[in-house]
Amino acid sequence: MGDTRVTVIGGGLAGSEAAWQLARAGVAVELVEMKPERRSPAHVLPGLAELVCSNSLRSDNPQNAVGLLHEELRRLGSLVLGCADATRVPAGDALAVDRERFSEAVTARLSGHPGVRIVHREVEDLPPPPALAVIATGPLTGDALAARLAEATGGRLHFYDAIAPIVAAESIDRSIAYARSRYGKGSGDDYLNLPLDEAQYHAFVDALLQGEKVPAHGFEEPRYFEGCLPIEVMAERGTEVLAHGPLKPVGLEDPRTGRWPHAVVQLRREDVEGTAWNLVGFQTRLTWPEQRRIFRAFLPGLANAEFVRLGQIHRNTFVDAPRVLAPDLSVRAAPHLFLAGQITGVEGYVESAACGLMAARAVLDRLAERAFRPPPAATALGALHRHLTGEAHPPGYDYQPSNVVFALFPPLTGRHRGKAGRKEAHVERARKELAPWIDTAPPPAVPAAG
């Protein structure tokens, strides 16, 4: 494979990880990074794999899904995790790093690898076939390249993500929530409904208007799509706007009263098993502490809500992965192109690095003319892959970026003692299932990072 050169576009965590995994398997890599020729508004440091803050890699505890992902990446010889461990700073069970030293370490390892050639220029067009390329240009992909990518994906490219909160099923008060689809359509248990009377509704709207918002960065001037407005922006347009929009009660009579409430918050099943529920239409720029406070205090049935994910809206270029990408992360309409990182719809630095590793493994399988072998579904890597393929989501799911969470994993079998017992069962199963997949990796040409 040493005579074959693969181009990796983007020197963030996904691109750096992909380049490393390819190079250590003996593939010649051209890593193209636009810095310092051009910087996005989020770039400050000169090197590769730039993080925005020291604790961006989050929890290192394997009882959390992202901590389990850390563990799996270490077992697979991840450059990102190796350099993170080498530049770690004390932060409890979080994997916090010295950002500058981390970026320098990643840059040094890649620039010092004989199989990696780093080129500094901005790419404005997609590489032509037949040579293989990994596109890992991140959430702030330049306009020219984004336009080419939109053409290649049939227009299924989004420029903002609008993420609504997700609540763990077990934390919803079922004595208040009731199952019903609008006008009784569907199976009847596709949605849970939280009824609000007029006083509760107005108190909730007031809390939304007064809640603290995340300030927009200079490159994130709020130009929202009318069909995907933040819930607080809708509230600003009039007291009853939400009651005629995402909280409209029409066709959702409360079985206890036989009448429509003044307003209804709908929760849609987020996974096939119903372990997590999405607050429909609740994309928001409220700060995360405010979301927890307001939704628990003012939404009936969510007083003890455990949030699997909190809402956000920000600039984020990403494709509709389940429809655009093949299972090996190649573009269906342009199979020589593989996507990796946040542009695929994974959220977070660790998830981006993991996606880069998966894309590299897919490229290696393509070069070896063998079928792609996805990570086992019950692993953290496999859960991310299930998200990208849509397997983790119910039919008709509106694809949005996601961190790795246990709700993306296949359901457990048997009985487990509480939430901690279920997490431990997920971890044990993932550890067991990852081992055979590790053994299928091509032998590295050089030692792994770390």
Curated annotation (Swiss-Prot):
Extract one GO molecular function annotation from the record. Answer: tRNA (uracil(54)-C5)-methyltransferase activity, 5,10-methylenetetrahydrofolate-dependent
Please classify the protein's predominant subcellular localization into one broad category.
Answer: cytoplasm
Q: Which lineage ranks, top first, belong to the organism behind this chain?
A: Bacteria, Pseudomonadati, Myxococcota, Myxococcia, Myxococcales
Gene3D superfamilies in the cross-refs = FAD/NAD(P)-binding domain
Q: Name one GO biological process term.
A: tRNA wobble uridine modification
Family membership, please give it.
Belongs to the MnmG family. TrmFO subfamily.
**What's the stated role of this polypeptide?**
Catalyzes the folate-dependent formation of 5-methyl-uridine at position 54 (M-5-U54) in all tRNAs.
Cell compartment(s), UniProt:
Cytoplasm
Question: What is the protein name given in its UniProt record?
Answer: Methylenetetrahydrofolate--tRNA-(uracil-5-)-methyltransferase TrmFO
Write out the residues that bind FAD: G10, G11, G12, L13, A14, G15
Q: Could you tell me the keywords of this UniProt record?
A: Cytoplasm, FAD, Flavoprotein, Methyltransferase, NAD, NADP, Transferase, tRNA processing
InterPro entries with a match to the protein in the record: FAD/NAD-bd_sf, MnmG-rel, MnmG_N, TrmFO
**Pfam families noted in UniProt:** GIDA
What's in the GO CC field? cytosol
Q: Which reaction does it catalyse?
A: uridine(54) in tRNA + (6R)-5,10-methylene-5,6,7,8-tetrahydrofolate + NADH + H(+) = 5-methyluridine(54) in tRNA + (6S)-5,6,7,8-tetrahydrofolate + NAD(+); uridine(54) in tRNA + (6R)-5,10-methylene-5,6,7,8-tetrahydrofolate + NADPH + H(+) = 5-methyluridine(54) in tRNA + (6S)-5,6,7,8-tetrahydrofolate + NADP(+)
- Would the keyword Cytoplasm be found if you checked this record's keyword annotation? yes
Q: Show the SUPFAM superfamilies listed in the entry.
A: FAD/NAD(P)-binding domain
In which organism is this protein found? Anaeromyxobacter dehalogenans (strain 2CP-C)
Enzyme Commission identifier(s): 2.1.1.74
Q: Cofactors per UniProt? A: FAD
Per UniProt, the enzyme's principal EC class comes to transferase
